[in-house]
Amino acid sequence: MMMRLLAVWLAVAVCAGAQTTPDPIVFVHGNGDDSAKWIGIIGLFESNGFPADRLYAVRFTNPSARTQDHVAEAGRSSTIDQVSELSATVARALLETHAKKVVLVGSSRGGMTIRNYLRNAGGSAVVSAAVLCGTPNHGVFAVGTGLDGEFNGNGDFLRGLNEGSEVVDGVRMMTLRSDKLDKFAQPDGRAAGLFEHTGVTFEGPALQGAENVVIAGADHRELAFSPQAFRLMYRFITGKDAVQDRVTAEAHPVVSGLVTGFAGKNATNLPVSGVRVRVYPLARGSARREGAALYDRTTDASGVWGPVVLDSTVEYEFELEAAGHDVSYFKAPVPRSTALMNLRLVPAAADSARGKGHLLISRPEGYFSAGRDAVTIDGALTKDEPAGLPVKDSFVATVPARVDGVKVQLRGETIWARPSEDFATRLAVVDLLW
């Protein structure tokens, strides 16, 4: 009997020893973006049992690249700026989790920063795997001028990353690319506002020696922020298939974030003080505010807003007010707690549609194409959505100026929003997650 009990105890001990804690994941956003881009993907990882305290997201101070990497430009960052901030986030993740290595997941420019970190900043010693999503590894264009540009495939930076082996010994690497809809991997760049002959191909994001996967029909951002991309990165990182492909809701998520703004025309992730942040619950099936603001505070020098406890079945309006200008973000019900709900104070602008009801329909995690993405307003297809190659992440829709608002839908996501009649004083944003 004792021998049998001992055998059972040993078997349990062996199984327990085999259950290793996963390496923490650091998510790395792209050009002009911020850490909030990863809210959906992080929610999917958590919903599949990945420990929430081992999921990190870097927030680059000045996320937009310089025109010339070695020439200082206000509100923009160099490749060294980027890799320095990534290195600091990795160091923090290792210290807090006591892990030996991390996994890095990067979108677009974030993938280039990951490669720079692995190759030139000692990152290969502390990284077990890397996933590069829509990263222009061979350039957005490859031309003979502007060789100090970060995105030039013939330039100094990318040639340095690609010479010799395109992957790094000891680090498992996967790339995700589109078959033909990535705006930054186009032989003809005119639709994206680039050269007619870019010198790059649809295969540009792939790397020799990596596991290269194609997501057919995906646009540039969907290669990082879509459920399809999640399933691929989850299997690559964990070695098993994800069970949940939708975010599992908490009853009362706790939400907070940072108010950010602009430096000239460049979006930054620097905190903005003196912004009044109000969070209003909306009546079900309407964009009408239901009662007083659930949260009402003015940001201090830290720019931090929240935390606020929400109901995951209720839609909310997140209103920013500063210097007589309002920005209202209408979002679908927030399913899980996050400290990454950063809200950008978009500057006031002249409004050519003043006097009519209109909304800014925004899709930060993807792009729009009328032939592919059926955006409906009150059940009818909108005529304002851009068509063709998906290159735009927002568009202005003219809608009825109703007090109760209109219903906007895309890919199963529904958001009620109250239109604006003058964007110069109040910008109304439908902020889609997927």
Regions found by a protein language model. Give the residues of each.
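The serine-hydrolase catalytic nucleophile loop
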Residues: 35-41
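Sec-dependent N-terminal signal peptides
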Residues: 3-14
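Serine-dependent carboxylesterase/thioesterase catalytic core
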Residues: 25-31, 42-46, 51, 57-167
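Beta-strand-rich domain onsets/edges
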Residues: 234-254, 263
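Hydrophobic beta-strand segments
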Residues: 265, 270-282
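Preference for solvent-exposed, low-hydrophobicity sequence contexts
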Residues: 263-265, 283-296, 300-434
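Short beta-strand/loop motif that positions the catalytic acidic residue
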Residues: 175-177
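Catalytic histidine-centered segment of alpha/beta-hydrolase-like enzymes
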Residues: 218-226
